[in-house]
Amino acid sequence: MLHNVSKGVVYSDTALKGQDGDREGMWVGAGGALAPNTSSLFPPEPPGASSNIIPVYCALLATVVLGLLAYVAFKCWRSRKQRQQLAKARTVELGDPDRDQRHGDSSVFVDSPHGLEPCIPSQGPHADLGCRLYLHIPQQQQEEVQRLLILGEPAKGWQGLAGQLGYQAEAVETMACDQDPAYALLRDWAAQEGSGATLRVLEDALTAIGREDVVQVLSSPAEGCSVV
């Protein structure tokens, strides 16, 4: 019986030694160091493979960051250029303040009269009468002119005079809503034209619409009026 037990122990030792031999077969000694056996089913990654991927990732990340920075810089440059163009256009548009003051709101008020020559004083005892400004004649004379312009048909009234003075139809419609449209017309014309709103210009426009009666009122000197 002892013989059989010893025999079993020998077999066990032999089996264990065989398993150890199989395990050792997976590693090959090289200079005292163990290296993996290349005949394995799943060969391990070569040493340093993971460290070689890191520079690639860093290069890709740097490329993405540089692309974003370039895009932001381009957008900022383009936005600044557009603001400069808008500011330049606004400067050109507002570069003539005298023009805006002279014409006012172009959608309502008058354009410059066409074909009207500047006032040139003529010779004679009343040489300066034609060059007098409408606003410089007496108030009573102005009111009489306005009263006559309200009477009669529109073509020969203040509407026709407005057309002769260069007003557009929409401006005439706006003035028609005023309580005294003739007064509004002559006041606006005198304010817009300034030194050009002379009696000669007004008389020429009245003659063109056949209102010689109003011309006579302008030509007749009023009592107690001093020539300016």
Curated annotation (Swiss-Prot):
Which proteins does it associate with, and in what oligomeric form? Interacts with NTRK1. Isoform 1 and isoform 2 interact with NGFR. Interacts with SORT1.
In this chain the Death domain maps to: 143-222
Q: Could you list which ranges are Cytoplasmic topological domains?
A: 74-228
Those parts of the protein on the Extracellular side are: 1-52
Biological process terms from the Gene Ontology for this record are:
apoptotic process; in utero embryonic development; Rho protein signal transduction
UniProt entry keywords in alphabetical sequence: Apoptosis, Cell membrane, Glycoprotein, Membrane, Nucleus, Transmembrane, Transmembrane helix
GO CC terms for this protein? cell body membrane; cell surface; lamellipodium; membrane; neuron projection membrane; nuclear envelope lumen; nucleus; plasma membrane
The terms under GO molecular function for this entry are: coreceptor activity; death receptor activity; nerve growth factor binding; neurotrophin p75 receptor binding
Keyword tRNA-binding appears in the UniProt entry: no
Which stretches are transmembrane?
A: 53-73
List the membrane topology term(s).
Single-pass type III membrane protein
SMART domains according to UniProt? DEATH
PROSITE patterns noted in UniProt: DEATH_DOMAIN (PS50017)
Q: How is it modified after translation?
A: Isoform 1 is N-glycosylated. Isoform 2 is not N-glycosylated.
Q: What compartments host this protein?
A: Cell membrane; Nucleus
What is the designated name of this protein?
A: Death domain-containing membrane protein NRADD
* Top-level taxon of the source organism: Eukaryota
